[in-house]
Amino acid sequence: MFGHAEIHDGVEVLDVGTGCGYGAALLARRLGDDRVTSVDVDPYLTKAAAERLDLIGLHPRIVTADATGPLTGEYDRIVATVSVRPIPPSWLQVLRPGGRLVTTIADTTIIVVADKTPDGGAAGRVMWDRAGFMRTRHGDDYPPDKLADRFREIHDREGDEVTRGRYPVVEVAEAWELQSMLEVVAPGIEHWYDEDDEGRRTALMVHPDGSWARATAMRDEAPIVHQGGPRRLWDLLDRIRHRRLVEGSLPLYGSRVRITPDGVVHLRRGRWTAVIGP
């Protein structure tokens, strides 16, 4: 992430997601304490990181705050090792003209690199590189898994529609390009996957709107697919897989990025477009 930011002497950096303090340590050693601010919502993490940094003689500014809320100061670089959706407007507000923002989009592996534009937004591209980080938090605890019970409910349920899928069952969470594209075009889907000792694969998909899908088959067979709710989630997935086969790749990586001052991300590559908003 720091490499994509093109950090050099003299820049001031906001490190979003202090964590253990490793990133802040690298930055402070390279740039000096007075040019590094690191922010994290978790007071335990910021306290522990500050103590670790003190032991090695480094004292960057460590702030305990919600990084998606109001921020102070001005920075030439903002590098986030947490993921967001959309981009917090406060990041754009504290980014100096021409400054660079590097972050990942929540629940994807896409890295957005964008430079501040005169209108208060930013422009750049989705890198060919990949990374994934936990989503930003807004309180003291990690959010509960609200859809866990749904997986149990649909494991043996008969679908409103039962069909045979076009392609073998895939573990979407491990197919990074596929999962990221699906999250951009149909955000909020959760996945579960299992393969038994005989090679039978089962994949479950659920969405907060009540849509769900279950696909089961041996490793390289076309699966039986049960689907229910307002949308056909497995059909969405199959359309993305078909596009990748027909065109050789998906248009997400390498796409141009335009971020409006309110943090909404607009993607474009060729005739393909997408919007990443709240």
Q: What do these predicted regions represent?
A:
Residues 13-14, 26, 41-44, 152-163, ...:
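Amphipathic, soluble alpha/beta structural segments
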Residues 2, 6-96, 100-102, 106, ...:
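Conserved nucleotide-cofactor-binding alpha/beta core module
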Residues 113, 117-132, 200-205, 222-227, ...:
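Short, well-ordered strand-loop elements centered on a beta-strand within folded domains, enriched
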Residues 174-231:
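C-terminal terminal segments
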Residues 82-197, 275-276:
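Class I SAM-binding transferase module
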Residues 4, 8, 59, 138, ...:
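Histidine (H) residue identity feature
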Residues 208-278:
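C-terminal target-recognition/interaction regions appended to catalytic cores
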